[in-house]
């Protein structure tokens, strides 16, 4: 039997980050919270494990899922702002740094096409970095 894959969105919140499951036909839902993205994902994983245990204790069938984490654009930009300048991200993604600033501060939302452009640029940059070897 194939496991369902569920999208889990990671977003910046007032006190850190939150992770939540996309609308699903499941009988349960999980969330995670933390001061960092890493803490948030770890908290989500704990919540998923606790949900599985709860179902086992109550004798209810638990539908195992596979989940993938997705950033919203503003949260990604906020998380990595200390590592990348907007000018640097413009060179990597091809998206104007003024627009990136609007996305970072929530003044505008990028179109789906722009989100894909940002994601493709970041992934290409990551591939380039992972291929490097230092002498």
Where are these regions (language model features)?
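Short, charged, surface-exposed hinge/linker loops at domain edges
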Residues: 2-5, 45-98, 102-115, 120, ...
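DNA-contacting interfaces and partner/effector-binding or oligomerization modules
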Residues: 1-59, 64
């Amino acid at each position: 039997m194939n496991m369902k894959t569920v999208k889990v969105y990671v977003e910046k919140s007032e006190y850190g980050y939150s992770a939540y499951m996309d609308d699903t036909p499941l009988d349960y839902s999980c969330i995670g919270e933390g001061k960092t993205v890493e803490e948030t994902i770890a908290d989500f994983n704990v919540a998923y494990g606790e949900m599985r245990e709860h179902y086992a204790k109550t004798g209810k069938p638990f539908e195992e899922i596979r989940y993938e984490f997705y950033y919203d654009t503003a949260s990604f930009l906020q998380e990595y702002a200390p590592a990348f300048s907007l000018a640097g991200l413009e060179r990597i993604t091809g998206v104007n740094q003024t627009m990136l600033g609007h996305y970072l501060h929530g003044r505008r939302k990028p179109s789906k096409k722009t989100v894909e452009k940002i994601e493709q640029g970041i992934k290409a940059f990551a591939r380039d970095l992972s291929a490097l070897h230092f002498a």
